[in-house]
From Swiss-Prot:
Belongs to the ELIP/psbS family. GO terms for cellular component: chloroplast. This is Uncharacterized protein Ycf17. GO terms for molecular function: chlorophyll binding. It is found in: Plastid, Chloroplast. The lineage of its organism: Eukaryota, Rhodophyta, Bangiophyceae, Cyanidiales, Cyanidiaceae. Keywords: Chlorophyll, Chloroplast, Chromophore, Plastid. It comes from the Eukaryota. Its main location: plastid. Possible role in chlorophyll and/or carotenoid binding.
């Protein structure tokens, strides 16, 4: 058990969910052509 922070499995799941959310936002942007990520200056 780590002294500080999250467990290793929690960090792994969090990273995978973050990657999935970013890929999903790219997919939605290309489908809807709203350019939300460009507006937020991520791309």
């Amino acid at each position: 058990m780590p002294k500080y922070g999250f467990h290793q499995s929690t960090e792994l799941i969090n990273g995978r969910l973050a990657m999935l959310a970013f890929i999903l936002s790219l997919f939605i942007e290309f489908i809807t052509e709203q350019k939300i990520l460009h507006f937020l200056k991520f791309l």
